[in-house]
């Protein structure tokens, strides 16, 4: 299989011949040490694909990092998921609102009956660092509307349904 690869923004395309199917992540891992930023996404034949996407036929691949709009959105979404998990682990079942991006950051609000303490904020931040260090995969799962309503409701997010 032939892959026309652009390893980073602005780089020339390279022609690769690969014997067996490979994921975008496996391909990106070959180039990552030479790249200035972590690969977060790939554009395969004009369509953005996750790192788990399996390349199994001739194609054109552009590796994308956070300098691109779409990869930056993936980064922000991943950060939001890590934040939500950390809040849940530290504070329990609290509703969290993640608002618009503000000046390269996210504005969030944790809905609690009592004000959040400095210690709790530090604990959430510490838990986020632990989750990042654990390098856990974020796996996309697809649900029916009914399943999604049930799941979001169980996590105290009825507005998501």
Q: Residue spans of the language-model regions?
A:
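Ubiquitin-like/PB1-type beta-grasp interaction modules and other compact soluble beta-rich domains
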Residues: 1-80, 84-86, 91-105, 126-130
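Non-catalytic interaction/regulatory segments
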Residues: 102, 112-161
């Amino acid at each position: 299989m032939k892959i026309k690869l652009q390893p980073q923004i602005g780089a020339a395309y390279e022609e690769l011949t690969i014997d067996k199917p490979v994921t975008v992540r496996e391909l990106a891992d070959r180039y990552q040490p030479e790249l200035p930023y972590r690969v977060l996404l790939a554009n395969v034949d004009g369509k953005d694909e996750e790192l788990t996407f399996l390349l199994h036929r001739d194609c054109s691949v552009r590796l994308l990092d956070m300098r691109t709009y779409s990869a930056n959105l993936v980064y922000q979404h991943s950060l939001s998921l890590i934040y939500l998990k950390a809040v849940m682990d530290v504070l329990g079942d609290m509703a969290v609102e993640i608002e618009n991006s503000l000046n390269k950051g996210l504005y969030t609000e944790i809905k609690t009956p009592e004000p959040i303490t400095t210690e709790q904020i530090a604990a959430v931040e510490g838990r986020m660092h632990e989750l990042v260090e654990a390098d856990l995969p974020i796996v996309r799962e697809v649900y029916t509307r009914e399943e999604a309503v049930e799941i979001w409701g169980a996590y105290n997010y009825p507005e998501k349904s």
